[in-house]
């Protein structure tokens, strides 16, 4: 099958799969947005200002953009504690469990802009096992759209950027993947297909992603 105006995605091969967490595997947006809205009210910052730069970025990077006069590390800790204090609304997207089960045994990593503490808490909440390789936002020098997280994940897998396909949901995430010389399948769960136009392929949901393995190769087949 093929994406309109793009290469035949059945020819999209890789040796490793890197997967974003929030917005891709799970819908954590309601809880995260509530935490940020409350934080904005306490600090006199309009929620609309936060929304313009929030998605896909590390908490500390968003704070530096919207409130450079505050101590970003201190405020990030406050936001993190708020986000993980109540995860009732956090849920997996359809197809997430099946995708991760099918990937078992293949080289893979989860890459998140969130902290390791938050990522592990959310994975436990939704019932997904902790991956062997989890790269979190607090392990890297620069967050998305910088490629640091994806480069680190590939290195831990013993792969080059060209060996990897990434599953992402945000424009800044797609930019990060491209900067890491990786190919990207974007899921239009949080943004329009047009906003994700730099990706190699765009699907509506995780359930539209399928693949088969042949030796060390993983071949993606996407339902459009």
Model-derived features: where do they sit?
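Asp-based, Mg2+/Mn2+-dependent phosphohydrolase catalytic module
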Residues: 1-15, 107, 116-224
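N-terminal helical cap/lid subdomain that shapes the substrate entry/recognition surface
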Residues: 2-3, 8-105, 115-120, 128-129
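Hydrophobic residues in well-ordered beta-strands that form the structural core
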Residues: 27, 110-112, 186
